[in-house]
UniProtKB/Swiss-Prot annotation:
It comes from Homo sapiens (Human). Induction: By EPO/erythropoietin. This is SAP domain-containing ribonucleoprotein. Residues 45-64 have a biased composition (Acidic residues). Interacts with DDX39A. Interacts with FUS. Interacts (via the C-terminal domain) with DDX39B; the interaction is direct and facilitates RNA binding of DDX39B. Component of the transcription/export (TREX) complex at least composed of ALYREF/THOC4, DDX39B, SARNP/CIP29, CHTOP and the THO subcomplex; TREX seems to have dynamic structure involving ATP-dependent remodeling; in the complex interacts directly with DDX39B in a ATP-dependent manner which bridges it to ALYREF/THOC4. InterPro entries: SAP_dom, SAP_dom_sf, SAP_domain_ribonucleoprotein.
Length: 210
């Protein structure tokens, strides 16, 4: 405080007035009055600054003694692997296509006629039904297979498919009629040989074979 009073005494009147204005004090009076005002102001504020330093010191001590809380890392739940295994099973089941269904799709792709038995087998394999043919259906399926073979052969050699199918149907009807009336269909008799020769000639004329 002694040094401050010495400094205030060294100041001029104009400088003392500026110091009073800076601190919000009155500038009226002589030099000695201004010095007293400034000294009283400095003493009051010196006590306040000391109190503030004490308070700030207490706060810093509390901050230093307060423990630092580290953030606790939450444990992540394990990933579910059940769904992945189930998806793999589904993919494996769908990839196994029955062989009969493959044959049917291949026949449709290349425009090859599929027999009735293969269609039934594919359908039975798709729906899980036993594909055991009955006695009544076994005899009817044979001419269908032969007819399909004739159609394939006719398409291969560029022949008329409708005429071949009609010829096979006529032969089948004639065969059934002979079986019904007990007519022998062996090639030993002369009548049967003439019939076969006539059929051969008609067939050659129909397809333009010399």
């Amino acid at each position: 405080m002694a040094t401050e009073t010495v400094e205030l005494h060294k100041l001029k009147l104009a400088e003392l007035k500026q110091e009073c204005l800076a601190r919000g004090l009155e500038t009226k009076g002589i030099k000695q009055d201004l010095i007293h005002r400034l000294q009283a102001y400095l003493e009051e504020h010196a006590e306040e600054e000391a109190n503030e330093e004490d308070v700030l010191g207490d706060e810093t001590e509390e901050e230093e003694t307060k423990p630092i809380e580290l953030p606790v890392k939450e444990e992540e739940p394990p990933e579910k692997t059940v769904d992945v295994a189930a998806e793999k099973k589904v993919v494996k089941i769908t990839s196994e296509i029955p062989q009969t269904e493959r044959m049917q799709k291949r026949a449709e792709r290349f425009n090859v006629p599929v027999s009735l038995e293969s269609k039934k087998a594919a359908r039975a394999a798709r729906f899980g039904i036993s594909s055991v043919p009955t006695k009544g259906l076994s005899s009817d399926n044979k001419p269908m297979v032969n007819l399909d073979k004739l159609k394939e052969r006719a398409q291969r050699f560029g022949l008329n498919v409708s005429s071949i199918s009609r010829k096979s149907e006529d032969d089948e009807k004639l065969k059934k009629r002979k079986e019904r009336f007990g007519i022998v269909t062996s090639s030993a008799g002369t009548g049967t040989t003439e019939d076969t020769e006539a059929k051969k000639r008609k067939r050659a004329e129909r397809f333009g074979i010399a």
